């Protein structure tokens, strides 16, 4: 797997948190979803949250948490981190590179 493919897989993994959160909210809203799927979504959310929080403390870790776990926009992340909006894109790239170093291969199958 190339570095670009690994990066894409990592981004899909982190962004899947939003999908699982939506599934959980749907389940909480009405019982349209089977309980086992909701439990699976909660488990996946805990796994992703644990992955992000296990990273070394840094501005990049905060960005990953705010953006992917918290669902905040890039602009809001910049504001929360006290940086210019144009800087948040560099922080995002550094954060993803840092996360890629911690991203185990077995998680590649999102």
Each model region followed by its residue ranges:
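Short, conserved sequence motifs enriched in acidic/basic residues, glycine, and aromatics
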Residues: 54-55, 82
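Short amphipathic alpha helix immediately N-terminal
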Residues: 55-72
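Secondary-structure boundary/capping signal
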Residues: 59-63, 85, 107
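Helix-turn-helix DNA-binding module
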Residues: 70-86
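DNA-recognition helix of helix-turn-helix
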Residues: 82-104
